[in-house]
Every structure is written in structure tokens, then in C-alpha cells.
Amino acid sequence: MNIQLFLSDRIRHALIMAGAPDDSDAQLHPSTKAQFGDYQANGVMSAAKKQRIPPRELAERVLEHLDLSDIAKKVEIAGPGFINIFLNEQWISQKIESVFIGPKLGLTPVTPQRIVIDYSAPNVAKEMHVGHLRSTIIGDAMARTLSFLGHHVIRANHIGDWGTQFGMLIAYLEKIQHDHALEMVLSDLEHFYREAKKHYDEDEIFAQRARDYVVKLQSGDPYCREMWRKLVDITMTQNHLSYERLKVTLTPEDMMGESLYNDMLPNIVEDLIAKGVAVKDQGSVLVFLEEYQNKIGEPMGVVIQKKDGGYLYATTDIACVKYRCETLKADRILYYIDSRQNQHLAQVWTITRLAGYVPESVSLEHHMFGMMLGKDGKPFKTRTGGTVKLSDLLDEAVERAGQLIRGKNPDLNETDLNNLIQAVAIGAVKYADLSKNRTTDYIFDWDRMLSFEGNTAPYIQYAYSRVTSLFKKSGLDEKKIMSPVIIQEEKERSLAILLLQFEEMISTVARDGTPHLMCSYLYDLATRFSIFYEHCPILNAKNEQIRQSRLKLAWLTAKTLKLGLKNLGIETVERM
């Protein structure tokens, strides 16, 4: 049950009954202090301002129409017109029971949507680097979360598998007479790409040969297509090893690269011209958008075809959106691309709406993110100033986690120890990113992310292992816990309410693409359980009924932590 949504609806109805405008909002949120109740509604303030009456007067009218007797033990007006709601302990216990016995922690079923999530998107012939980390793990966390809720999620790995670089690479491989393309690895390709780029910039004959190969590739030349496919396969084979290490759910079947839309591009341009959306201008084809103006106030032109007949990223992205709506039947499309692409995407979406490719009912959302920075506040680099490869970053995470964990677990066998190290290392890297608001830059700090204190993956993983250890000592499993939850202590009450707020939290994350809120929730839950554990004896409770009640709260805490971390793509461990 989404308590926040339930209470908001009731308060909004009472506001309207009290004479407030029909568009009034309860502005309900969990209270930050116990003296203000469990939830506080602030919507009276803005509604009263519109009506030009004292907020407290409107609040009193609202309470006359607000019946929460089935859920709250007390509803009071505080300050100038805030409404504080104190939940009833018996109602809390009943809802905890529903969560305990219900599938998916008793979540309300959603109306399923077809949701396309565009994330990761590495380039061919280059190793993945730290710049790919945020898109990959934030996008995957959202894919997991939305799938868990019951939506049909289509993962789209929009790899850069087309363009001039392939002509350059094919020309260079021919130049050095490289006959062993199947034996190449990605590091070879990176070296070849750098050399090919150098020749392309310095040797006009080579550059023309590369351009000729691009034309041949686009026209379906068998040799060029075979070489192109090998280059893509070599790259993505290596990238999928990184996905496996990161516990990312992308598969080869999710690959929807730029090349997928090639055959659509000529028709897209013709159609946009025919509809009057695009115009020919000095040999090029452009779309002029009134919404975007240049420095002198003229509509900005988005080029979709160059004078030489070539297409641009905008053309491909227009075709991509069209494909996702018409072929994939998307209801919602989420893009996990960095903030620098915001205007580009906005222009593409405006064009697709003008052309009628995207119905108004389809939501197009850019869930942009900031950069990963070093401790110096500059983009994260190697000590020599180079780009940090993703594989090197993960290797270092494992090494650092191993140094922390090996000494603390001397009796673990090597297999279990390595599994623990991997879970902590990869979890720490992912959580450090996911726990930050994606719209901001963040500082990458090894010491902080691997700490067993504070808002980190190791802290939450440890909290989970602590509960599983408790159950082993109890000799019970959850199926044998028959007693209902009895709330007598404030620490029990506080933990129970937070457990009930899981649904409103995961709903917010799914709506806004904000996994950092789930991280904050899990950290709060782990912390609140620790306080509960210290103040409320569990195994040594004063009677069996209280013992089972508290074990039930502990079991729900463990299940919620495990489920929350799983939706973030982070493993739990039974022992730390």
C-alpha cells in the first residue's frame, strides 16, 4: 500500500470539500520529527493563499471533512496551518502483516507499460571507460526496478557502430595487410584506431580511401560488411565481460546500434520534407525550430542531411525514436545520457512530435546525469592524465576490497572469500554512484565507498548479514513465525513505519528515475534497524510473542534490504 498516495487523496478531497480549488495538492510528506506525527500535509498554506483566507481557518474546515479514523489515532493542526497525522499502531500492525504474507512485499500491482530504456551505449573499437559507468549502472538499476514492478522493459544498448571510423579502420587494416582479424582483441583495435585516425588526418590519399570504404559499407559491400561485423563482435564480446562483472543485465540481444536505423534515413528525410517540417537550404536539408533560436533571435536550424548526402546523429536519433514508438510500441522512453546531450535530444524530440512520429501519450524523458570527478574536483583520470578504463577500475576495486576483507574473515574458504570480495567491491563502486543525485557531479573516493560506516554498500550489506545471522541463532525461519507484530516500543513503531514506506519510495524512483532515493531509504532502514536492535531485545525478549514479533520485523528488514539492493544491481552476502 502506498500510504502517501492514500493519505494525499483523502486530504485533497477534504480540501476541495472545504472550498479549496479543484487542483489543490495535499503536499504530503513523511514528517522529519516525531512531534509532527508520521506524515505532514502543507497544502493548506498555498490553497488558503489562493482563497485569501487565514490558513488555519481553512485547515479547521479541512479537518471537518477529513475522516482518517480507520488509519490515524490523531490528526492535528500545527503552526499556521500544517496538518499532522499520527498513524494508529493497530493499523500499522495490520499493514505489516499484509506486507509479510504478500508477494513483492505487498506492493500494489501497476498498470503495465512498455518502457524502452536507452543506456550504456559504448562505441565500437574502443574499450569502455569510466565515462560509461553512470549511464550503464543507473540505467540498469532503473531497468531492474521497472521490471520488478511489473512493466515490460525493453533494454536498448544504442552502441556507436556506424560512421567514418569504420572506413578508417578497414582502410588501415588493409594498409598493414592484417589478415588475422578474427584473432584481434579490443586493445588491438584501439591501437589500430589511433593509428588510422593519425593517417586520416595527415594523409589525404588514405582519407579518401577511408571515405570510399564508408560508401561501400553503406551500400552493402560484402567485404566491408564482413569486416564491420568482426569489429563490432570483437568490441561487444569484451564489453559484455564488463557487464557480467558489473552484474548488469544487458545482453547481446539488447544491442540496438546506430546501424539498425540506416535503411530508414532516406525515407525520414523525404517524409520530413513532404510534411513541411524540413526544408532544403543551399544543398543541405534542415529543420528550423521556433523553440530554439540563435544569438540574433532566428530559428535554429537542425541539419538532417549534409550537402554530400550524408546523414547526421540527429537523423539517426529521429529514426530511432520513430522505431521505438512504431515498432517497439513504447509507452515511455527513458534516455540515460549525460547532460551535455540535453539540447540535442530536445530538438530531436520536437522534430519527431512535429512529424507525428510520436503520439502525445508517449513520454520521452532525458534522465541526464553529471560527471564522475577525482578528489581534485576535475574529471576522473589516471595519474598520467589518461582515461581510466572500466576494467582497470573494477580490478582496483577488487584489490582494495580484498585488502579490507581477507584479514577480517580468516576462516572462510577461498571460493567464499572471493565471492565476498567481488560482491563488496562491485557493490561499493555501483552504490557510490547510485547513491548520488544523478543530476550532479560527484567525487569518486575509494576510502569512502569501501567504508563499513555511513551511506555505503558495505554498510548495508553488513546490516543484511547481521539479520541473517540473527535468524540462524534463533533457529526459526519466517514460515514458523506465527505471532502478529506487536508495537509497544517507539523503536518498533519507527522501524515498522519505514518498512511500510517501501512502496511509496520505489514508486517515486520508478516515476522520476532517481535511484539515489532508494539508496537513502536503504541506508535509513539499515540505521533504524541497528537502533531497534540495540534497544529492543529480540532473541532474549521477555516472552515468545514479543520475540516472534521482533523477528518478523527483522525478517522484513532483511527482505527489504535484499530486494532494494537487488533492484540497484547489488548483491547481498550472508556473512561478512
UniProtKB/Swiss-Prot annotation:
Compartments it resides in: Cytoplasm
EC main group: ligase
Gene3D superfamilies per the UniProt record, alphabetical: Arginyl tRNA synthetase N-terminal domain, HUPs, Isoleucyl-tRNA Synthetase, Domain 1
BP GO annotations: arginyl-tRNA aminoacylation
Organism: Hamiltonella defensa subsp. Acyrthosiphon pisum (strain 5AT)
Protein name: Arginine--tRNA ligase
Gene that this polypeptide is encoded by: argS
Matching InterPro entries: aa-tRNA-synth_I_CS (IPR001412), Arg-tRNA-ligase (IPR001278), Arg-tRNA-synth_N (IPR005148), Arg-tRNA-synth_N_sf (IPR036695), ArgRS_core (IPR035684), DALR_anticod-bd (IPR008909), Rossmann-like_a/b/a_fold (IPR014729), tRNAsynth_Ia_anticodon-bd (IPR009080)
Similarity-based family: Belongs to the class-I aminoacyl-tRNA synthetase family.
PANTHER family for the chain: ARGININE--TRNA LIGASE, CYTOPLASMIC, ARGINYL-TRNA SYNTHETASE
